[in-house]
Amino acid sequence: MNTGKVDVLLGLQWGDEGKGKVVDVLTPKYDVIARFQGGPNAGHTLEFEGQKYVLRSIPSGIFQGGKVNIIGNGVVLAPDLFMQEAKDLEKSGHDLKSRLYISKRAHLIMPTHRVLDAAIEASKGKNKVGTTGKGIGPTYTDKVSRTGLRVGDILDNFEAKYEAHKAKHLKQIASLGYTDFDITEVEKTWMEGIEYLKQFRMVDSEVEINKVLRSGKDILCEGAQGTMLDVDFGSYPFVTSSNTICAGACIGLGVGPNKIGNVYGIMKAYCTRVGAGPFPTELFDETGAKIRDLGHEYGAVTGRERRCGWCDLVQLKYSVMVNGVTQLIMMKSDVLDSFETIKACVAYKLKDGTVTTDFSYEIDDVEPVYKEFKGWNTDMTQFTSEDEFPQEFKDYIAFVEDFLETRIGIISIGPDRAQTIVRK
């Protein structure tokens, strides 16, 4: 039987790798683009026809005419934020209602989830994990404890269900001694978002996706955040509340592992992280500041300043392993265009002096061991072929490929979709 394939696109670092742009480059090859986890805490930034967009919940394939986009069961959805995002796209002339399907099994982020998020974070004192405050963690907590509200719930007796969940949350918030909140206005907008959601096609997305595959069509699964924020395999507890790795696509969309084809792993030519948590190659000097300025490293949703550092190949090798990456995509190579010297971490030195190339359970106190490369000192942003790459950049690419035992198939040399080199 001639069935379609499911390819997965995901970040290999701590998020913000540039997944949105790459999805936009890859989407012409696929019939359906599906988001499989996460919520509005992660923003995909794309530039399309000279205009910048930040997508928080809607799959990046929405800019491609004729493509079906699916928000899968693994996603947590905030109706008010979704409504704002969707209406902004509609104002720009993008048709959503006929091409965007939403899983009935996706969980809803309630206004009280956001208050709970703030209350729980405040109660941690110095041990805060750096939440975005969007209510993601408490929503996934309700999901796992089997007490959450789902998109499908809005179709029948919703108000009673909502009030029961709200009352439960308010008790939890009171028990934490948190009083600094008023959800009146937010709740009003949230309910408007619920009515707006009803205008979209709510589906059993796992059934729809498998029908698409049986008809011979191909699907691109889009992850949010990055591998190192995975709740199981990331730098716990400084992680998100969902599985961001390739296996999460099967769970978050309802497809069998045998349906997975290519796994595209996205990495920056350097590395960034937002919020607290270990970051072995972080730079605290003027080099880190230069990377931040040249790369415009500020959160798409929060505006938070990102921590910047050199590329960590030990961490990336781990990410390639747990995801089964078949092809690498290197983003923001142009940010390093003006550096005299470029470094990449090739090993960790542990507290006892041992040197290892394994990414371990505890990376708080490791010291990075670097390999230095001569910078290419060339503006690559106007290049149209890999043949134009300077030798120094070719050497850097070759070393990364050799270390990770995986080919780099696509290289981004600027923010625009046209500034993308697909290698031979």
How does the language model describe each region?
Residues 1-424:
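Non-transmembrane, aqueous-exposed alpha-helical and coiled segments at domain scale
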